[in-house]
Each structure stands twice: as C-alpha cells, then as structure tokens.
From Swiss-Prot:
Biological process terms in GO annotation: regulation of DNA-templated transcription
Organism of origin: Bacillus licheniformis (strain ATCC 14580 / DSM 13 / JCM 2505 / CCUG 7422 / NBRC 12200 / NCIMB 9375 / NCTC 10341 / NRRL NRS-1264 / Gibson 46)
The keyword Transcription regulation appears for this protein: yes
Protein name stated in the entry: Probable transcriptional regulatory protein BLi00754/BL02339
Keywords recorded for this protein, A-Z: Cytoplasm, DNA-binding, Transcription, Transcription regulation
Organism domain of life: Bacteria
Length: 239
C-alpha cells in the first residue's frame, strides 16, 4: 500500500499549494454536512469527519464557523452529491465526487474537462468496482507495532498499518474511521497528517512519461472545477 500513500501525499501537496480553493471546497462541504444533520459535530458524524479532515489542511476557524452558522441560519441553498466515473490517457481510471447546486452545469463541466485532456466519461459503475472505499489515518509519534498493539487493545481490526516517511499510516474500513481515531487520541495522538475517507485503487498503474504528463493535467483540471470535491485515480504518481 506504500504507493497508495504516495498518491495521497501528492494530492495533499497539490491541494496545500492552492489554499483559497481548498478552503472554499471545505466551506461548502462543512455547510452541507451541518445542514443535513445537527450543526454540533458530536451529534453529527458526517460533520465530525469533515472537520477532522479540515484540520489536516489547516482550514481557518473563521471559515469553519461561517459555514456552520450559514447552515444554522436556515439557508435555502441546496447541494446534490454526485459521482462521475471516467478514463484518462491509456485507460487510466478516474472517479470524481462533486457537490453542486446545478447538476447540468457540473455534468457538462466534468465531461468537457475529460474530453479536453485526453479522457472520456464512463457510465456509472465502469470504474468504481476497481476501487475500495477506505479510511486512511496518518500520524507521527508511534511505530507501526505500537499502533497495532493499541488498536488490538481497543478491539479494532484494520486492513493494514505501514510506516512511511516518519509517519504511521493506518488503512481501515470506512465505518472504523472514528473508532480508529478515538483509540489513537486516547493513546495521546492529537495531530493527524492525514484523515481521509478515500477510494483506493485495487491496482495502481504506471504511465509512460507523455501520457503521465497529460494525465496530471487532467487531474489538475478536474480538481480546479468549482463543484468538484474529490478526485480519485489508479495512477502511481509517486514513482
């Protein structure tokens, strides 16, 4: 799973480089989570998860509070959660998750972006079956063995625990996200380098240099779309 962590690192690095964009996306995601449930994260697991993710991207408190207050204020702005699947150069697989208040606009934007960058949209299910929904939690201050021991003591099973670049990365089932994080917090871990619910490719692929350059342009263009929240793919960008 080391290569999978490479992809997450590359993704975080690219997003960290464009803070205004990522803050805007988090503001929307926090608003939607708070509006769909309680505005209190202790009573709303979806909101709690989004806030934990936001911490790893250093989203300012003011943006978080503004989004929650907007939801509390009874804003009538509604968003649909959408998933698109498609292919990039050399048949590389791509999943795009979006939050939108205009489904037709978003579908057209995503389709156009695929087409302009050597890819094409697929039908629902054409790609997702090659990915596994996965909770990924990364932190420093423990070894993989110590992490395994404390999770076993908490009676939590996970898929894998790896040490990568001075950090420990835990891969778990999505419904174990909060249990894993709480067990780690109880063991003294307070800062997380990554806290994601992601779609991990079952098999990564390497692309030739020219195709890889075009693929990276496709991913960047998709992530630049206002309505797109997450982009997942099966290309090893850490090679």
């Amino acid at each position: 799973m080391g290569r999978k962590w490479n992809n997450i690192k590359e993704k975080k690095a690219s997003k960290d480089a464009n803070t205004s964009r990522i803050y805007a996306k988090f503001g929307r995601e926090i608003y939607v989570a708070a509006k769909q449930g309680e505005p209190d994260p202790e009573l709303n697991q979806n909101l709690k998860f989004v806030l934990e993710r936001a911490k790893t991207y250093n989203v300012p408190k003011a943006i978080i509070e503004r989004a929650i207050e907007k939801a509390k204020g009874g804003s009538e702005e509604n968003y649909d959660e959408l998933r698109y699947e498609g292919f990039g150069p050399n048949g590389a697989m791509v999943i795009v998750d979006a939050l939108t208040n205009n489904v037709n606009r978003t579908a057209a934007d995503v389709r156009s972006t695929f087409g302009k960058n050597g890819g094409n949209m697929g039908v629902s299910g054409s790609v997702a079956y090659m990915f596994d929904p996965t909770a990924v939690i990364g932190f420093e201050g423990k070894t993989a063995d110590e992490t395994l021991e404390l999770l076993m003591e908490a009676d939590i099973d996970v898929r894998d625990i790896l040490e990568e670049d001075d950090a420990v990365i835990v891969y778990a089932e999505p419904d174990q996200f909060h249990a894993v994080q709480e067990a780690l917090q109880n063991a003294g871990i307070t800062e997380f380098t990554v806290a994601e619910l992601t779609m991990l490719a079952q098999n990564d692929v390497a692309l030739p240099e020219d195709a890889r350059a075009q693929f990276e342009k496709l991913i960047d263009a998709l992530e630049d779309l206002e309505d797109v929240q997450q982009v997942y793919h099966n290309v090893d960008l850490g090679a």
